[in-house]
A protein has these predicted regions:
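Conserved mixed alpha/beta catalytic, RNA-binding, or beta-rich assembly cores of soluble enzyme
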Residues: 67-108, 116-122
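Short, small/polar residue-rich loop motifs at catalytic or cofactor-binding pockets
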Residues: 46-49, 142-144, 163
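Short, small-residue-biased leader/transition segments that mark boundaries at the very start
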Residues: 2-9
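Internal active-site segments that recognize and position negatively charged phosphoryl groups
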Residues: 40-74
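Short beta->alpha transition motifs characteristic of CBS
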Residues: 65-69, 159-164
Length: 183
C-alpha cells in the first residue's frame, strides 16, 4: 500500500523497490511483436483517442476519454485525457466534454472545463462554447484538436480545427449519426 495513488514513470524503479516489487531489465518488455508494433506506429505517426459523453434518463452527465497516447513521447509525460478539466469534464449544471488533440494545449487552457464555464457564466450554447474554445483559445496558440459534448438538455455538439475527426452519436430514439470531416 502507498500514500501516493498516482505516479508517473519518474523514479519508478526506486518506487518499485520501496514497494518490494520484482524488477526486470527493460529488455524483458521488448518482444518481436512489441518491436514490430512500435516500428509500425512510428512509421504511421498516428495515434487515436476514444472519447464518450452521455446523458442518462435521470439527467446525469458523464464523460470519458481514453488516449491512444503519443508514440515516442518523453518518458513520464501525462497527457490531457486523465486530467479532469483538461481533456475530460462533466457537470450536471451544463455539459459533458471529451477532447482529443495536442494535450499540452488542452492542459494549459483547461479546455474541457472552459466549455462548462462559458455555458454557466456567459450563457453560451454548447456549440458556441465549443467553437469559442477551439477558435479563440486553441487555434491562436497553434493547438490542434477537437471536442465532443452533450448538454443537460441532450443536445450533442462537436467542434475541431483539424482536417477531420471521427465521431458518432445516438439519441434516446435510437437515431444514429456518424461523421468524419464536416464540422
Amino acid at each position: 500500500s502507498t500514500l501516493f495513488p498516482y505516479t508517473t514513470l519518474f523514479r519508478s524503479a526506486v518506487f518499485a523497490k520501496e514497494q518490494q516489487l520484482e524488477l526486470v531489465p527493460n529488455e524483458y518488455f521488448i518482444t518481436p511483436e512489441s518491436k514490430e508494433r512500435f516500428e509500425k506506429a512510428k512509421s504511421m505517426d498516428k495515434h487515436g483517442t476514444v472519447g464518450c459523453v452521455a446523458l442518462d434518463m435521470n439527467g446525469n452527465l458523464a464523460a470519458g476519454t481514453s488516449t491512444g497516447g503519443m508514440m515516442l513521447k518523453k518518458y513520464g509525460r501525462v497527457g490531457d485525457s486523465p486530467i479532469i478539466g483538461a481533456g475530460t469534464y462533466a457537470n450536471n449544471q451544463t455539459c459533458a466534454v471529451s477532447c482529443t488533440g495536442h494535450g499540452e494545449y488542452f492542459i494549459r487552457n483547461a479546455v474541457a472545463f472552459h466549455v462548462h464555464a462559458l455555458m454557466l457564466y456567459k450563457k453560451l450554447t454548447l456549440r458556441q462554447s465549443l467553437q469559442f474554445v477551439v477558435d479563440s483559445v486553441l487555434t491562436p496558440q497553434n493547438g490542434t484538436g477537437g471536442l465532443i459534448a452533450v448538454d443537460k438538455k441532450g443536445n450533442v455538439a462537436w467542434y475541431f480545427n483539424t482536417a477531420g475527426m471521427f465521431r458518432a452519436s445516438m439519441d434516446s430514439n435510437g437515431i444514429k449519426k456518424i461523421e468524419m470531416y464536416s464540422k
